[in-house]
Amino acid sequence: MSAICVDSVFLLGLYDDRDQYHARANELFVAYFNNIFNRLLVPWPVLYETVSTRLVRHQKNLALFERDWRRLTGRGQLILLDDSPYRQAAIDECFSEVRVQRRESRALSLADRVIRHMLGETKIKVDVLITFNVADFADVCRRLRLHLVS
């Protein structure tokens, strides 16, 4: 059984058939989560970014999201990760970018910074990260020896 964390770019691609990553996201979802032994780890900030106005305006897409949500929950495969222990450090990192030369700064969203902190947390077991923003996570995955899938 693998613990697989995802970011919002993956979920947005999965539930929007017009998204450039839709086909690949669907392929990965089938490969990893039709297997009842894998668990889907979703940090709360990922949900806030995914269940956006864009998603809720398209009932068909929201219905697909709900279907998968209920199926994974029913199988015990869906784990929601509390971000509260990581919020302050993540926002402090965002603000510290103001004091860094532009070419040395990292333009990472608050949600991505929270995910990066969660990946390094020893209390949270993560085996795989699925993202289409490889550059935002390659260093931390390499350092922690996590499998990065895109």
Predicted regions and their residues:
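Metal-dependent nucleic-acid phosphoesterase active-site entry motif
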Residues: 1-23
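Short, flexible helix/strand-to-coil boundary loops that buttress conserved ligand/catalytic motifs
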Residues: 15, 54, 141
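Acidic, PIN/NYN-like endoribonuclease modules and their adjacent C-terminal/linker elements
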Residues: 3, 116-150
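PIN/NYN-family metal-dependent endoribonuclease catalytic core
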Residues: 5-6, 27-58, 70, 80-82
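Short, basic/glycine-rich phosphate-binding loops at helix/coil junctions
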Residues: 6-9, 71-73, 92-99
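A metal-dependent, Asp-based hydrolase signature
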Residues: 59-65
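Alpha-helix/helix-capping structural signal
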Residues: 9-10, 45, 135
